[in-house]
UniProtKB/Swiss-Prot annotation:
Subunit structure: Monomer.
Sequence repeats (start-end): 191-202, 210-221, 227-238, 244-255, 259-269, 273-283, 287-297
Region (N-domain): 20-197
Gene encoding the protein: crt
Protein name, UniProt field: Calreticulin
Amino acid sequence: MKAVVLVVVSLLALSSINCDVFFEEKFPDDSWESNWVYSEHPGKEFGKFKLTAGKFFSDPEDDKGLKTSEDARFYALSRKFKPFSNEGKPLVVQFTVKHEQDIDCGGGYLKVFDCKLEQKDMHGETPYEIMFGPDICGPGTKKVHVIFSYKGKNHLIKKDIRCKDDVYTHLYTLIVKPDNTYEVLIDNEKVESGDLEADWDFLPNKKIKDPEAKKPEDWDDKPTIPDPEDKKPEDWDKPEHIPDPDATKPEDWDDEMDGEWEPPMIDNPDYKGVWAPKQIDNPAYKGPWVHPEIDNPEYTPDSNLYKRDEICAVGLDLWQVKSGTIFDDFLITDDPAAAKERGEVIKKRQEGEKKMKSEQDEAEREKEKAEKPDDEEDDEDLDDETGDAAPVEEHDEL
């Protein structure tokens, strides 16, 4: 058994050695302040980040990350690293988000930039390569953004991916592969995958409707027609309303003063509505006409949709109404297995967070109970003694 364990450990170590880690940040100490750059873009009041493990955690040191600290603020913070291209290999972007403030409206996503990023001028309109991560605003928006820049235009994924909306740490992973496929994982579990060309509007449609094709004039696409043999019954036509036969003229009605009395109108019980002949199958029905398609002359395949020619920066460029989100464990690599291995610790972190928060909640309940005024407790005791409960209804036995 020990030999098997050693082999597994050796294989994982070999995987880690062979993979390229282009960027990794775990915020172990205050050194982040010299590595990350705040934007000074004019006209925006940017919020500040603080290094903290938050109010509940698994490890007070290992769980430290950057926390948004000011409500109703834009945030713009970035870091550059050695540039690289993912040509011919996978691209993995991974990080954790902890909305411990129970966020109501705000972003939790990461942007990936090329080297043209001017860090001190970064803002919402700054071009980026990739935008990935959760975004929450009210009950209607709880989604994972996956946006790629292609030929100068940002393209949003056509699928809806739901993000986590609780108060614990969650791991978000984007994997882009050289075969133009992708995967999105949350907490190391695949939540979406597919083909880049199919799930984004990078390219024009392969096929278009033939502009020369026209539906034939004699094409009958009505599945049913009125029955030509059906005839309206002779007694069909009845008025919709009739005078109320039970109504009588009031005794004090004066025809000279009030005019000629007329009984009020009521719905006619014999009224059958507008007659229409019954429908029968159309013998000339040819089915719905399908517009024929042709190859789109504007379509050109691109085998390099996955490729980013240059990546050299990441940034947190977002808005939050209620601050308190903690970002941590940034990783950009070419090895999905190595990223998954690093992500396994997040499950243990969640367990520790839930345990501490549960203890905190219980302590808060005990504190509130202890701080209750004595007269409230006396009233509760009196209620218990007098049996002040809802009356029980008596029922006859069957």
